[in-house]
Amino acid sequence: SSDVCSSDLIHNVESVLVTGASGFIGSFIVEEALRRGFGVWAGIRSSSNREYLQDKKIHFLELDFAHPGELCAQLSGHKELYGKFDYIIHCAGATKCVDKNDFERVNYRQTKCFVDTLRELDMIPRQFVFISTLSVFGPIREKTYTPITEKDTPVPNTAYGLSKLKAERYLQSIPDFPYVIYRPTGVYGPREKDYFLMAKSIRRHTDFSVGFRRQDLTFVYVKDIVQAVFLGIEKQISRRTYFLADGKVYRSRAFSDLIRKELGNPFVIRLRCPLIILKVVS
């Protein structure tokens, strides 16, 4: 039957599970994994938007990270049919929350639960990729404007950064766990919405910025993150942490000027909001 053939094919290729597969970074990782010939499983919620997951070769696996018992059943059911995954790329997480406690719940506790379940079921992959963030460090070199190094001590100043840091430290605390952590800076590219809103604002002749002090910005293109992830898989690296950026530093004004240039240099009114107001609002 076609099911048997499909199952045989799945067993004969290296398998990769991408959690958060319907998201910005996850959807591009799925595309590249397919292009490289992996058996690709998209880890999604039942409510996930599948707009960028249309390829017929994608296998879907619903994962309920909020309920440990359900998650265990879903993963053990997969193991029974197909065995464990060769690689897991964990993109699932929260970047925006109304309640700050949700960052801790989703980014730390649910990641911990996921990893604990994999260990319990003997489903530890060859490599567990964790997509973290530069935000784990916080503004530690804000006064000197010098580059962050691996030897710096993270001091996150947001609930988001703290939740990702706690998840990182948990992975690092497990002896012999084959993690690879990537900390992208500001990620841009197709399907991204935040920088798109900034471009939209400039096109409508308003350049809005926060604070009156110098702001240095760093960026990385989404497809460069994808290439880094698969290079790490190719090289079979383990228990390493990497920053991902394009190697350049931009002043906030220079960044908005770049967007203006791409939009044909529309005139703009520059508005600045004091940082204290943003902190009160958030």
Language-model regions: role of each:
Residues V16-R36:
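N-terminal Rossmann NAD(P)H-binding glycine-rich loop of SDR-like oxidoreductase domains
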Residues G232-S282:
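Mid/C-terminal beta-alpha module of Rossmann-like enzyme folds, strongest
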Residues S1-S6, F255:
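Short, small-residue-biased leader/transition segments that mark boundaries at the very start
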Residues F137, V180-L197:
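Flexible, glycine-rich beta-alpha linker
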